[in-house]
UniProtKB/Swiss-Prot annotation:
<keyword id="KW-0732">Signal</keyword>
<keyword id="KW-0722">Serine protease inhibitor</keyword>
<dbReference type="Pfam" id="PF12559">
    <property type="entry name" value="Inhibitor_I10"/>
</dbReference>
<feature type="compositionally biased region" description="Acidic residues">
    <location>
        <begin position="53"/>
        <end position="63"/>
    </location>
</feature>
<keyword id="KW-0873">Pyrrolidone carboxylic acid</keyword>
<feature type="region of interest" description="Disordered">
    <location>
        <begin position="23"/>
        <end position="63"/>
    </location>
</feature>
<protein>
    <recommendedName>
        <fullName>Marinostatin-L</fullName>
    </recommendedName>
</protein>
<feature type="compositionally biased region" description="Low complexity">
    <location>
        <begin position="32"/>
        <end position="44"/>
    </location>
</feature>
<feature type="modified residue" description="Pyrrolidone carboxylic acid">
    <location>
        <position position="43"/>
    </location>
</feature>
<feature type="site" description="Reactive bond">
    <location>
        <begin position="48"/>
        <end position="49"/>
    </location>
</feature>
<comment type="function">
    <text>Inhibits subtilisin, chymotrypsin, and elastase, but not trypsin.</text>
</comment>
<feature type="signal peptide">
    <location>
        <begin position="1"/>
        <end position="29"/>
    </location>
</feature>
<dbReference type="GO" id="GO:0004867">
    <property type="term" value="F:serine-type endopeptidase inhibitor activity"/>
</dbReference>
<keyword id="KW-0646">Protease inhibitor</keyword>
<dbReference type="InterPro" id="IPR022217">
    <property type="entry name" value="Prot_inh_I10_marinostatin"/>
</dbReference>
<comment type="similarity">
    <text>Belongs to the protease inhibitor I10 family.</text>
</comment>
Length: 63
């Protein structure tokens, strides 16, 4: 009995032909029932602080 890897079966089960409407959406066209993507306001990234040997807050970390 020949066995096929699990992920190969999973991938094969997930593939199917796209409909005309789905092709239109993936190609960047306008599909009638698809709502437009809302713009997300840009927010700056939070920076992570790393502790140093003698921190400004008075904590001393062992070297």
């Amino acid at each position: 009995m020949k066995t096929t890897p699990f992920f190969a079966n999973l991938l094969a089960s997930q593939t199917r032909e796209l409909t005309e409407n789905e092709l239109e959406m993936t190609a960047g066209g306008t599909a009638s029932q698809q709502s437009p993507v809302q713009e997300v306001p840009e927010q700056p990234f939070a920076t992570m602080r790393y502790p140093s040997d003698s921190d400004e807050d008075g904590f001393n970390f062992p070297v």
